[in-house]
A protein has these predicted regions:
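Catalytic cores of alpha/beta
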Residues: 17-22, 80-97, 135-136, 158
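Conserved SAM/AdoMet-binding glycine-rich loop
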Residues: 1-54, 59, 66
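Structural motif
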Residues: 28, 67, 96-97, 141
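Hydrophobic faces of well-ordered beta-strands that scaffold small-molecule active sites
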Residues: 5-7, 31-35, 71-75, 101-103, ...
Length: 173
């Protein structure tokens, strides 16, 4: 038996028709929607080509929660040129509109534009110590009513360039 439905999407892909469908499904089985916010820092939003304003996330998350659907927000820690404070601001912002949060380390993968900037020394990947430090501070500001669904992830080892330590997430956990 299906116990619940979890949908991961972009906030700009949730139009009124999708909302109606999700609301209908939520009456049959619980529905969770994971929204990819990644960051709220505008220069980072442009850099990663997210493609929508923070207000689109807020609008979609609010509409989903208003119809009884739990929202889980995805945040990437370690984006180029983001300070620890920038990352914590994104976490804090996401928690205002979420029932859950997924925290993900930035992975630099082969065949990406990000790799070129990394190889050109435009930014450094986080060390494990930096990531754990940021993660601990992030966890400390997440309200008790917001479920932490992920503390880290592991990139595909065949294409992972950096940080290589992230290939073994058990070490991080």
């Amino acid at each position: 038996d299906i116990v619940a439905l979890s949908v991961a999407t972009r906030p700009d892909c949730v139009d009124d028709n999708v909302l109606k469908l999700l609301e209908k499904l939520n009456k049959i089985k619980p529905v969770w929607v994971e929204l990819g916010l990644q960051t709220i820092k505008e220069s980072s939003v442009d850099y990663i080509r997210r493609g929508y304003e923070n207000s689109v996330y807020v609008d979609t998350a609010t509409k989903l929660r208003n119809i009884g659907i739990e929202v889980i927000t995805h945040i990437i820690l370690g984006l180029p040129n983001e300070s620890k404070l920038d990352m914590l601001r994104s976490v804090d912002f996401a928690c205002k509109y979420s029932d859950g949060i997924k925290l993900q380390l930035l992975h630099i993968l082969k065949g990406t534009d990000l790799l070129k900037d990394y190889e050109d020394s435009k930014f450094n990947a986080l060390t494990m110590e930096q990531y754990i430090n940021i993660l601990c501070d992030a966890v400390s500001i997440i309200p008790k009513n917001v479920i932490i669904h992920r503390l880290t992830g592991d990139g595909d080892k065949k294409i992972l360039v950096a940080p290589l330590w992230s290939g073994n997430k058990k070490v991080v956990l």
